């Protein structure tokens, strides 16, 4: 019977799936927002009937917010035209809009390592009360070729009365609205055919999509190389 390294944190259970390159689980390195008590939030998770790569493509395409979610509570503002830029980080990259910030879904940061996750901010209108931007930390778990499960922590950095007010408003009013936005993503991605990439036409806004595909392709090559090396060692 195979066992796995399991850690409970941030109201979730993290299971390490060993690989030939990393058979022993490294320390669980969570995003700061999931360990810092100054951040308050809620975890939402949902099974999606689409390949996990479609979900990742969607997350690194900030321009989709002002189109797909144009009638939503948080994403109805800002320009529908812009240029995207990509900046490398020590552990991944950030893709962001050039001409605006803080008006819509304007940037995504991807982090790669023992786990892959994204970080992004959404603007909150004045009706949401004090507390600043609405941050999302997202993980995408592949299930099989046609299914994945998404985990999104919805967070806000606030304290005292602002924290209590936001948590109350989220449960009483905002949660349903945020789920409606997530459903728009799920329905769109679930309706995409498996071979959609064969008919796509990428353009400048898709610089994040192109980048994450290159990263994932290299990660797959490294994994296959590690498995081949492990098989050769076992055969000796």
Language-model-detected regions and their locations in the chain:
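C-terminal catalytic domain of Rieske-type non-heme iron oxygenases
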Residues: 21-236
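Short Fe-S-cluster ligation motifs
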Residues: 1-20
């Amino acid at each position: 019977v195979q066992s796995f390294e399991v850690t409970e944190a941030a109201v979730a259970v993290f299971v390490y799936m060993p690989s030939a390159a990393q058979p022993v689980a490294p320390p669980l390195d969570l995003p700061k927002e999931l360990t810092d008590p100054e951040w308050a939030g809620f975890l939402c998770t949902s099974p999606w009937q689409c390949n996990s790569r479609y979900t990742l493509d969607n997350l690194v395409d900030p321009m989709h917010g002002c189109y797909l979610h144009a009638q939503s509570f948080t994403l109805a503002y800002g320009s529908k035209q812009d240029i995207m830029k990509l900046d490398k980080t020590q552990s991944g990259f950030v893709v962001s809009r050039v001409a605006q910030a803080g008006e819509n879904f304007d940037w995504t940061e991807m982090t790669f390592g023992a786990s892959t996750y994204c970080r992004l901010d959404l603007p909150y209108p004045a009706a949401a009360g004090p507390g600043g931007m609405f941050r999302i930390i997202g993980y995408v778990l592949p299930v099989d070729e046609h299914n994945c499960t998404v985990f999104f922590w919805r967070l806000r950095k606030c304290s005292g009365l602002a924290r209590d007010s936001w948590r109350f408003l989220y449960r009483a009013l905002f949660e349903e609205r945020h789920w409606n936005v997530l459903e728009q993503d799920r329905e769109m991605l679930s309706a995409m055919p498996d071979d959609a990439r064969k008919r796509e036409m990428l353009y400048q806004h898709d610089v994040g999509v192109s980048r994450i595909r290159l990263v994932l392709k290299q990660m797959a090559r490294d994994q296959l190389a590690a498995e081949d090396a492990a098989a050769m060692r076992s055969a000796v």
